[in-house]
Amino acid sequence: MNQHVDMLRGEVSLYLQSMGLRPSTKGYQYLCFALIQLLQGTPFQNTIWAVTAIHFDQALHNVLRCVRREIKHAFVENPERFA
């Protein structure tokens, strides 16, 4: 199971970095966690952001703000990646 999670983490990491997201940010960490959970078939798909907030002991609005900020930063840096 850990090998599978490590493989997913690597794939998600490569994808997020190819989109210009920075691994050192909280938004990246939150997105990485949420995507790995979804790829593993979490039963909480409709509440993945709430689950992410609970996992990181953060308020939901803080998690969403960090994710939006990181995606916006990546878009401003290179909008072509999102075409």
Predicted regions and their residues:
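Basic, alpha-helical nucleic-acid-binding regions used in initiation and control of genome expression
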Residues: 4-26, 33-35, 40-83
